[in-house]
């Protein structure tokens, strides 16, 4: 069994074809961990923007990805193929903080490949939902009712190092 902690970055862009907005993936970020949650391997690739050619200001500030990065990135089909190959064929469980990453991956898969099932994702765990089951809810919830990652870490006094993927580093400590 493989454990994959996924941290996607995306840009919300208007799509004429959809006549609405889509969260277009601009970076695949993930790491594989063993049964003791030690990092085995990491994966990261910047994706060439095909829908939104310019990043929103908050996306640039949060991710430190530039418009030049997404114009020179790997096309989505190739990035997805690289990610799929990196994941491999072993049974797996994908983790993310909240369901935003998995929903965005599904929507991009539907948009670009016209398929609604991702064959290489066998199992999925929303680490935020899992943590909400045992961390006191009233002390940590934000206005939208979600459990903020950094607040969760502070409550359980986790030490973590900030890397290119803060969420991935934090999830490794939480799980």
What spans do the regions from the language model cover?
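Metal-dependent phosphoesterase core characteristic of DEDDh/y 3'-5' exonuclease domains
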Residues: 21-28, 32-63, 85-175
């Amino acid at each position: 069994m493989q454990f994959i902690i996924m941290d996607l970055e995306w840009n919300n862009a208007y799509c004429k074809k959809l006549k609405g907005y889509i969260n277009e993936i601009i970076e695949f970020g993930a790491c594989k961990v063993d049964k003791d949650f030690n990092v085995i391997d990491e994966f990261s690739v910047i994706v060439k923007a095909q829908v939104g050619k310019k990043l929103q200001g908050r996306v640039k500030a949060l991710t430190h990805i530039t418009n030049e990065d997404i114009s020179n990135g790997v096309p989505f089909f190739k990035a997805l193929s690289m990610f799929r190959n990196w994941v491999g064929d072993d049974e797996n469980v994908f983790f993310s903080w909240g369901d935003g990453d998995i929903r965005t991956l599904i929507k991009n898969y539907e948009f670009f490949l016209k398929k609604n099932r991702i064959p290489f994702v066998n199992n999925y765990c929303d680490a935020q939902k899992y943590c909400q089951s045992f961390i006191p809810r009233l002390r940590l919830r934000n206005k939208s009712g979600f459990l903020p990652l950094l607040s969760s870490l502070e409550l359980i006094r986790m030490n973590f190092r900030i890397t290119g993927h803060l969420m991935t580093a934090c999830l490794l400590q939480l799980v």
